[in-house]
A protein has these predicted regions:
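Short loop/turn motifs that connect adjacent beta-strands in outer-membrane beta-barrel proteins
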Residues: 1-7, 19-24, 51-60, 88-99, ...
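Surface-exposed beta-loop-beta
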Residues: 1-50
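Transmembrane beta-barrel strands of outer-membrane/channel proteins
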Residues: 8-14, 61-67, 82, 98-104, ...
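Sequence/structural signature of outer-membrane beta-barrel proteins
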Residues: 15-20, 31, 52-54, 66-73, ...
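Membrane-embedded beta-strands of outer-membrane beta-barrel proteins
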Residues: 43-47, 82-84, 100, 125-126, ...
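Outer-membrane beta-barrel transmembrane domain signature
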Residues: 75, 91-95, 99-131, 147, ...
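Outer-membrane beta-barrel "beta-signal"
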Residues: 156-169
């Protein structure tokens, strides 16, 4: 199907000074919503701010969420996540980032037979971004996925790893 989507997002970014050498974005608060020609609609929002705790060179706490009740368009109609990013945990590595996060996706109760029938899927994440030089970083990540895909099959969880390589030219 082809149709229109209408999205509105409002952002607020307080003007505060950043610590010298910070690579993290400033504080940001966002809220928005969308609607489509096919009765798809939803709300979303996020917030990012400095924790105020003496964590490394700089840090950010973040939370985000979304809700879209139409199962035909979204098998996971709700999401809530959050985390913490700390820059310069180790004094000799001021550009590195320690990343901690978690998320919870609520799965639709209106799922037809054969679809996931558990109420949620969740994830915990631990990552570390190594800044190798000004143009290259390496980010290994470890994730534990709870209740994978919401299936009723007894699966204790999935442990997964990944490595992201970023090169800026």
């Amino acid at each position: 199907k082809v149709g229109d989507a209408h999205i509105l997002q409002l952002n607020y970014s307080p003007k505060r000074s950043q610590p010298a050498g910070s690579v993290l974005p400033g504080e940001l608060f966002s809220i928005g919503g969308f609607t489509t020609d096919y009765q798809g609609e939803g709300l979303f929002g996020s917030a990012t701010w400095k924790s105020g705790l003496p964590l490394g060179l700089d840090d950010r706490v973040w939370i985000g969420g979304a809700y879209s009740p139409e199962f035909d368009l979204n098998q996971a109609p709700s999401f809530l996540g959050g985390g913490l990013v700390i820059q310069g945990v180790f004094p000799k590595r001021p550009q590195d980032l320690l990343i901690l996060g978690g998320g919870h996706a609520g799965l639709s109760a209106a799922a037809p037979p054969g679809y996931p029938n558990q109420p949620y899927e969740g994830v915990l994440e631990l990552g570390y971004r190594l800044q190798l030089n000004p143009n290259l970083n390496l980010q290994p990540t470890l994730q534990w996925i709870f209740n994978p895909s919401g299936r009723d099959i007894p699966t204790p969880g999935i442990l997964t790893t990944s490595v992201q390589i970023s090169l800026s030219l």
